[in-house]
Design a protein with these regions (language model features):
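Extended glycan-interaction surfaces of carbohydrate-active proteins
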Residues: 1-94, 116-159
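C-terminal hydrophobic structural anchor segments
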Residues: 98-126
């Protein structure tokens, strides 16, 4: 019954971000529909979701929070508090989201397109730890909290 009602999120490529109101934005949230322990998508749709993530959001530092083609996309986490907060979920790259991506690839028996250079990330801003976020566009500057537990957890889980 849950699988059937979840189909309201289906779109041609990937999943809708929200259905009330309907949002066609390409965000990383959809990767969790593939990576969670109890599959809610059939294999074809799950592969479609991972394809969208790889094409639109995957970077060498993690997943973008919004695809670059969106009108609300912000390439940099910079400026005053208001501007930084506004960019937080509008493109900024989050390393911890790779947990969902790697788990989805594993479940679908797919080779991940990118393996993060964790050794480099451990030196980006705080020696021996991984920061919270990165800029969405090159060069991907390390930003946010200089030592973020969920970013480190991602590295520990997938090393």
């Amino acid at each position: 019954k849950v699988k059937e009602s979840f189909k309201v999120f289906y779109k041609e490529h990937g999943l809708y971000d929200t259905v009330e109101p309907l949002s066609d934005k390409i965000r990383p949230n959809q990767i969790f529909a593939v990576s969670l322990d109890f599959p809610i998508l059939d294999t074809e749709k799950a592969n479609d979701v991972v394809d969208v993530i790889e094409e639109e959001l995957l970077t060498d530092k993690g997943l973008k929070t919004l695809n670059a083609g969106d009108e609300d996309y912000r390439a940099r986490y910079e400026g005053d508090v208001y501007n930084r907060d506004a960019s937080y979920h509008e493109g900024t790259v989050w390393p911890w989201l790779m947990m969902g991506y790697y788990e989805a690839c594993y479940k679908l028996k797919r080779k991940p397109k990118i393996l993060l250079d964790v050794n480099q990330m451990l030196e980006d801003r705080c020696i021996g730890s991984i920061c919270e976020i990165y800029d969405a566009d090159e060069p991907r500057r390390a930003n946010g909290a200089i030592s973020q537990a969920w970013s480190v957890a991602m590295a520990i889980l997938y090393l």
